[in-house]
Amino acid sequence: MAQTAYTQGPSAIADLMIPKLLSPQTIQTRPGLVQRVRAMIENNQVSGIAGDLMAMAERLDSVPLLKQITCPTQIIVGELDQATPPSDAKLMADQIPNAHLAIILNAAHLANIEQPEAFNQIVATFAQELGKEKQN
């Protein structure tokens, strides 16, 4: 995909990535949000987009390191996420001691902007639970 960025530009990357980042329902019913995500992608320099894509493609598997995480961890994933599918998020949650996993319905990779109320509620609940633990 990095080559696509260099040869066809940011718009081509947006065309490829938007279906992975947003749910089909969002793409069909929220054109303003789709345009906002498109602008976020297209406003980047080609070299930055290509560099990010190459770095993601070449990154090492860090799953073995997850067991070393000792801080409270909340993993949030969209049920339709293609970039980090729920099965991958579950794998992470299973490897991190005492991790919490939340799956947001009708959302993909950008669940925080597709379903902000659900996302914010998960974060708020997690933070409240941390506060209760600290008091005890």
Model-predicted regions and their roles:
Residues 7-68:
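Conserved alpha/beta-hydrolase catalytic His-Asp/Glu region
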Residues 17, 53, 92, 119, ...:
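Hydrophobic "lid"/C-terminal helical patch
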Residues 20, 47, 74-76, 102:
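Conserved hydrophobic packing residues within short motifs/helices of P-loop NTPase cores
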Residues 43, 59-60, 82-83, 110-113:
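A short, basic/aromatic alpha-helical/loop segment that forms part
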Residues 65, 72-74, 97-100:
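Structural signature of beta-strand start/N-cap positions in the alpha/beta core
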Residues 69, 75-77, 81:
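Short beta-strand/loop motif that positions the catalytic acidic residue
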Residues 71, 85-94:
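Short alpha-helix in the alpha/beta-hydrolase fold that links the catalytic acid
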Residues 98-136:
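Catalytic active-site module of serine/aspartate enzymes centered on a nucleophile-bearing elbow/loop
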